[in-house]
UniProtKB/Swiss-Prot annotation:
Gene3D superfamilies: Amidase signature (AS) domain. The keyword Heme does not apply. Allows the formation of correctly charged Gln-tRNA(Gln) through the transamidation of misacylated Glu-tRNA(Gln) in organisms which lack glutaminyl-tRNA synthetase. The reaction takes place in the presence of glutamine and ATP through an activated gamma-phospho-Glu-tRNA(Gln). The lineage of its organism: Bacteria, Bacillati, Cyanobacteriota, Cyanophyceae, Synechococcales. InterPro entries: Amidase (IPR000120), Amidase_CS (IPR020556), Amidase_dom (IPR023631), AS_sf (IPR036928), GatA (IPR004412). It catalyses: L-glutamyl-tRNA(Gln) + L-glutamine + ATP + H2O = L-glutaminyl-tRNA(Gln) + L-glutamate + ADP + phosphate + H(+). Keywords: ATP-binding, Ligase, Nucleotide-binding, Protein biosynthesis. It comes from the Bacteria. Its EC number is 6.3.5.7. GO terms for cellular component: glutamyl-tRNA(Gln) amidotransferase complex. This is Glutamyl-tRNA(Gln) amidotransferase subunit A. Signal peptide: none annotated. PROSITE patterns: AMIDASES.
Length: 482
């Protein structure tokens, strides 16, 4: 159920907030064993939050904007008093001593926390297969992955186990699973939402954002969690607009740029290409002007990302040494031996792989050839976007080259797995807002996502375009049966 449907239930007195929240837990208890979208649920706290909202309703008091909306949180975002594991053996028993800014703003806005969702370990992956708590399944086909790293968040929304979820996006980790699961996923401008309380992966790329059933729900959450934060020096001190104001504005005359390089890439699945191009035709029928643009270095984004992100990860994850917190090995005759064993036993294969890549890229004699060169290419990618936005208002691409793949397909082929992020990483490298919306299905019945990229702090523009498309695209409003 989306926010508006839930509000109708509440305001018409068909159900109390407590009853609605309890219904979600009943569904989770009965069905999440098939999906494994949650690492843990927080039923007692959720019921208490729901009762508080019910009291406000009974007393005819003004309700906060997200009053009674059941929301799940990706388990790399700190929630005070609740385990924040990053789906890793390293933090399996870590309980956060403070609340992240983003989740704190959600609860202040009346949102209700249902629990913490599964992810790839430390958010490093594209399939949610590397979690120490097990693989998450795609509700559209439980033999397939939900995408990653926010796969648990996307799967929980698609399965109806929450009304919305919060994820993090470093190279596509909100948008790619949103595409695979047939829901909406928004990565805001870098700095639009505070990263305080988000366990760091790659600090110049990470961003928190919503995964929802509808574009308007994403706009509501973005409005609630955005804004300056004294705890995050990278958080922008810019006014936060009401993203709902212009959602229904006509897009007649909107200039949408079709990035030529994306549609010519040999890895793009023909069914995905056909569906997204049909979406382009729909935008044109709605009054948008379609313009082909070139971003010559767009496809260099994936190689650039897989130097920069592991480099930053190797520095950020150096703190997990078994001394202050996190997993500590019982073996080791001295500090160095204990630290080495703690990291070897605490981190999974993919995390260790990325730490090694990053350490190598930053090492003496190689940083010029790899890390510094990647930063130069990153600047060129941003310049390509700058040039494109001189001609158009919004850019359009497929979200992913393919639909959801089978579990295990790329477990032993990390390079092919990395290509899942081919079309999403450039927006992270440039710090731009981007949204994935459903645009159709392939012949197997699997969802296909369409990505809209906006200029810096122009979330309102991509939300408007996405919402008009969503309203028009009645044919794709299906839900998975599992």
């Amino acid at each position: 159920m989306n926010f508006n449907s839930l509000r109708k239930e509440i305001t018409s007195n068909n159900a109390s907030v407590k009853e609605l929240v309890n219904d979600f837990f009943v569904k989770i208890d009965h069905k999440d064993s098939k999906i494994n979208s949650y690492i843990c649920t927080t039923k007692d706290n959720a019921i208490a939050q729901a009762e508080d909202i019910d009291k406000l309703i009974q007393n005819n008091e003004k309700l906060p904007p997200l009053a009674g909306m059941p929301i799940a949180i990706k388990d790399n975002i700190c929630t005070k008093g609740v385990a924040t594991t990053c789906a890793s053996n390293m933090l399996k028993n870590f309980v956060a001593p403070y609340e992240s800014t983003a989740s704190s703003k959600l609860w202040s806005s009346g949102g209700i926390c249902l629990g913490k969702t599964n992810l790839d370990e430390f958010a490093m992956g594209s399939s949610t297969e590397t979690s120490v708590f097990g693989v998450t399944s795609n509700p559209w086909d439980i033999n397939r992955v939900p995408g990653g790293s926010s796969g648990g968040s996307a799967a929980s929304v698609a399965a109806g186990f929450c009304a919305a979820a919060i994820g993090s996006d470093t190279g596509g980790s909100i948008r790619q699973p949103a595409s695979f699961c047939g829901v909406v996923g928004l990565k805001p401008t870098y700095g639009r939402v505070s990263r305080w309380g988000l366990v760091a992966f790659a600090s110049s790329l990470d961003q928190i954002g919503p995964i929802t059933n509808t574009v308007s729900d994403a706009a509501e959450i973005l409005h609630s969690i955005s804004g300056k934060d004294p705890f995050d020096s990278t958080c922008l001190d810019k006014p936060v607009p009401n993203y709902l104001t212009d959602l229904n504005k006509s897009i007649k005359g909107l200039k949408i740029g079709i990035i030529k390089e994306c549609f010519e890439h040999p890895g793009l699945n023909p069914e995905v290409k056909e569906s997204v191009l049909s979406g382009v035709d729909r935008f044109q029928a709605l009054g948008a002007e379609i313009i082909e643009v070139e971003c010559p270095r767009f496809n260099d984004g994936i190689a650039t990302y897989y130097v920069i992100a592991p480099s930053e990860a190797s520095a950020n994850l150096a703190r997990y040494d078994g001394v202050k917190y996190g997993y500590r090995s019982n073996e080791g005759s001295n500090l160095i031996d204990m630290t080495s064993k703690s990291r070897a036993e605490g981190f999974g294969d993919e995390v260790q792989r990325r730490i090694l890549i990053g350490t190598y890229a930053l090492s003496a004699g190689y940083s010029d050839a790899y890390y510094k060169k990647a930063q130069k290419v990153r600047t060129l990618i941003r310049k390509d976007f700058d040039n494109a936005f001189k001609k158009v208002d919004v850019l359009l691409t497929p979200t992913c080259p393919t639909t959801a793949f089978l579990k295990g397909d790329f477990v032993n082929d990390p390079l092919s797995m990395y290509l899942s992020d081919l079309l999403t990483v450039p927006a992270n490298l440039a710090g731009l807002p981007a949204i994935s919306i459903p645009c159709g299905f392939d012949t197997k019945g699997l969802p296909i996502g369409l990505q809209l990229i906006g200029n810096v702090l122009e979330e309102d523009r991509i939300l408007n375009a996405a919402n008009i498309f969503e309203i028009d695209a009645h044919v794709i409003k299906k839900r998975p049966l599992f």
